[in-house]
Amino acid sequence: MASTALEIVAFVVSISGWVLVSSTLPTDYWKVSTIDGTVITTATYFANLWKICVTDSTGVANCKEFPSMLALDGYIQACRGLMIAAVSLGFFGSIFALFGMKCTKVGGSDQAKAKIACLAGIVFILSGLCSMTGCSLYANKITTEFFDPLYMEQKYELGAALFIGWAGASLCIIGGVIFCFSISDNNKTPRMGYTYNGPTSAMSSRTKYQGGEGDFKTTGPSKQFDKNAYV
């Protein structure tokens, strides 16, 4: 019962993390920068992995998609690959979790379901690591440019999508670890012992081996006949 509750908690936590990680891909605010005037904000720049946008003081946004993938910076390509891998791994991890949980009717025997649930935990951990790496790589590029005094282009700050990605990655890792611990809890189930109360077998003294060679001692028919047997 305890292992089933752990699996349910792990599934809810992992799925929540996967949803958060997936929501970062279409989110616009991976990095944000504002240009302030004397009274109001004159422009707001924001970008994600696919496009860069600018919003003027009237609230009208103009966006421009990034050029060909071969013309992109290396860190953007790496972040794209890592985030797509995180979403894909989380999808397969959720399927494995459904087959491996004890509360479901699919997956085979308890031993097979335990192995599938452990595999789901490993996949969720990998998904969280991919998301954590992608968001951290993007954030490192932003902070490096922001604190570089020689960088003269537009400087950005961390956007909301990065924090959502970090939170989702943490939940995926925590859920995967709980899945793995639930398997170790299954292996600690006590085994019931059985005692045999049947009759003990005993060899009759007539059938015991006699002699060193292990031959049975048999008594042949009597060679002495009564005289009355013959007429």
From Swiss-Prot:
Entries under InterPro entries matching the protein: Claudin (IPR006187), Claudin10 (IPR003554), Claudin_CS (IPR017974), PMP22/EMP/MP20/Claudin (IPR004031)
What keywords appear on the UniProt entry? Cell junction, Cell membrane, Endoplasmic reticulum, Ion transport, Membrane, Tight junction, Transmembrane, Transmembrane helix, Transport
Single GO biological process annotation from the record: calcium-independent cell-cell adhesion via plasma membrane cell-adhesion molecules
Looking at the UniProt record for this protein, which Gene Ontology cellular component terms does it annotate, in alphabetical order? bicellular tight junction; cytoplasm; endoplasmic reticulum; plasma membrane; tight junction
TM regions (residue ranges): 1-21, 81-101, 116-136, 161-181
Q: Which residues lie on this side of the membrane: Extracellular?
A: 22-80, 137-160
Q: Which residues lie on this side of the membrane: Cytoplasmic?
A: 102-115, 182-231
Molecular function (GO) terms for this protein are: identical protein binding; paracellular tight junction channel activity; structural molecule activity
* Known tissue expression: Expressed in the inner ear where it is detected in organ of Corti, marginal cells of stria vascularis, Reissner's membrane and spiral limbus (at protein level).
Q: Which Gene3D superfamilies does the protein's record reference?
A: 1.20.140.150
In the record, the note on similarity to other proteins reads: Belongs to the claudin family.
- Its biological purpose: Forms paracellular channels: polymerizes in tight junction strands with cation- and anion-selective channels through the strands, conveying epithelial permeability in a process known as paracellular tight junction permeability.
Subunit structure, interactors included:
Can form homodimers both in trans (interaction between CLDN10 molecules in opposing membranes) and in cis (interaction between CLDN10 molecules within one membrane). Interacts with CLDN19.
Q: What is known of its domains?
A: The fourth transmembrane region (161-181), which is missing in isoform 3, isoform 5 and isoform 6, is necessary for integration into tight junctions.
In terms of PANTHER family, this protein maps to: CLAUDIN
Name recorded for this polypeptide: Claudin-10
Q: Which organism is it from?
A: Mus musculus
